[in-house]
C-alpha cells in the first residue's frame, strides 16, 4: 500500500490472521478530535460507511470526540447528511477573527445542515449505527465565558496535566452520551469521573454541539437536557484521540489522520503521553501514510491553523482542503481492496510502538 498505513493491536492481529476482516467483526468505529484534519478521512468514511460496514447483521457503535462526533452524527444518518455536513464545513468564511459566540453560531450552521429534516430521529432509529460520543462537564470556574480568564484557567489545567494526567479529574468529568437501544462495550470506562446520558431527540443537537465546543475559541453549551445543569465543552480536553478502554472482544476500527494517538488535548506537547497496549489491543488504526501526506500541497493535511495561514484568502484555503479531500479517495480504495481480497493481514503493522 502506498497511501494507507494500518496498525493493529495484538488481539486484532490475531483475529485478522484467523478470519481476515469482515464487517461483522467490527464492534466499534472511533472518531478523534482534530478540527479540519478530518477532511483527509473523507475517502475512508465513504468506503467504510457506504458499501462495507453496512453489510453487517448487527449494531455497530460509533464513538466520537469533538469533530469525530460531528462526522458520526452525519454518518449515522447516511451519506446525504454527511455530504451536507461536509459542504457546509467547507463553506466556512470568516472576515475577521470571530468571537466565541460568533464561531459557535457559524459552526451551528453546518451542524444544522447535517441534522436538518429530523436528523436526531434518524440517528436514533438507524438500523445498525449506534451513535455514542463524549463531552466534558466543567465546574464553576471553568464555566466562565470571558476569553482571558478562561484562557488562564485552561493554562492552569495544562500545568496540572503536565504533572499527571489523572489530576484533570479534579477539574473535569467525562460525559458519555449514548443511543439507549444498546449499551456500548465501553459504558463502564474509568479513568475520570463519568456521567452517562441516554440520547433523546431533544438532546442530540446540544450534546453534539457541546462535544466540539473548544474552550476560548467557542462558547460552551449549558444545561443539556437529561445531562443535568452545568457547562459542557469539547470532549478533546480529556479524550483528544480516544485512548480509552474500549473493552469488548471484537475489532475497534479507528480511521485516523495520523499515526500518533494523543490521549488528551493538553498532551499534544507531551510526546511521551501515549495509550496503553491493553487499551489498544483490539484497535485497527487506519491512517494516511507518510508518502501520502508528503504528496499533498505543502506536505501536510488541513488543520485549524489554516484559518490563520489563509486569513482573507478563504478561496485558497477551500481549494487546498478540497484537494486533500479528493485525494483521500485513494485511502478508501486501498482499504476496500485489502478487505475484499482478504490481504489486509499482509499490511498490518504492530500498534505497540505507538503505545507506552
Predicted regions and their residues:
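Patatin-like phospholipase
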Residues: 1-61, 74-356
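Catalytic nucleophile serine of serine hydrolases
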Residues: 66
Amino acid at each position: 500500500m502506498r497511501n494507507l498505513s494500518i496498525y493493529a493491536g495484538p488481539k486484532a492481529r490475531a483475529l485478522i490472521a484467523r478470519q481476515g476482516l469482515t464487517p461483522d467483526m467490527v464492534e466499534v468505529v472511533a472518531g478523534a478530535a482534530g478540527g479540519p484534519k478530518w477532511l483527509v478521512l473523507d475517502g475512508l468514511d465513504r468506503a467504510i460507511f457506504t458499501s462495507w460496514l453496512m453489510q453487517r447483521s448487527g449494531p455497530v457503535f460509533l464513538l466520537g470526540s469533538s469533530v469525530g462526533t460531528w462526522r458520526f452524527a452525519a454518518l449515522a444518518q447516511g451519506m446525504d447528511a454527511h455530504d451536507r455536513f461536509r459542504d457546509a464545513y467547507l463553506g466556512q468564511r470568516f472576515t475577521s477573527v470571530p468571537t466565541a459566540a460568533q464561531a459557535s453560531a457559524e459552526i451551528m450552521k453546518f451542524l444544522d445542515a447535517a441534522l436538518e429534516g429530523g436528523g436526531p430521529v434518524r440517528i436514533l432509529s438507524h438500523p445498525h449505527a449506534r451513535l455514542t460520543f463524549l463531552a466534558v462537564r466543567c465546574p464553576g470556574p471553568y464555566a466562565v465565558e470571558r476569553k482571558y480568564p478562561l484562557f488562564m484557567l485552561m493554562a492552569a489545567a495544562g500545568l496540572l496535566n503536565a504533572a499527571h494526567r489523572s489530576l484533570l479529574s479534579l477539574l473535569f468529568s467525562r460525559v458519555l452520551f449514548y443511543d439507549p437501544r444498546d449499551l456500548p462495550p465501553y459504558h463502564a470506562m474509568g479513568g475520570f469521573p463519568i456521567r452517562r446520558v441516554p440520547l433523546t431527540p431533544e438532546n442530540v443537537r446540544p450534546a453534539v454541539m457541546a462535544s466540539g465546543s473548544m474552550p476560548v475559541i467557542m462558547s460552551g453549551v449549558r444545561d443539556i437536557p437529561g445531562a443535568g445543569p452545568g457547562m459542557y465543552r469539547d470532549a478533546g480536553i480529556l479524550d483528544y484521540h480516544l485512548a480509552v478502554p474500549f473493552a469488548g472482544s471484537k475489532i475497534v476500527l479507528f480511521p485516523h489522520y495520523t499515526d500518533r494517538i494523543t490521549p488528551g488535548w493538553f498532551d499534544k506537547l507531551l510526546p511521551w503521553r501515549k495509550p496503553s497496549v491493553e487499551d489498544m489491543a483490539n484497535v485497527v488504526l487506519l491512517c494516511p501514510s507518510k508518502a501520502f501526506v508528503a504528496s499533498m500541497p505543502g506536505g501536510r493535511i488541513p488543520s485549524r491553523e489554516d484559518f490563520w495561514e489563509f486569513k482573507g484568502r478563504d478561496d485558497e484555503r477551500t481549494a487546498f482542503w478540497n484537494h486533500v479531500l479528493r485525494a483521500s479517495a485513494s485511502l478508501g480504495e486501498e482499504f476496500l481492496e485489502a478487505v475484499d481480497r482478504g490481504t489486509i493481514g499482509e499490511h498490518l503493522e504492530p500498534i505497540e510502538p505507538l503505545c507506552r
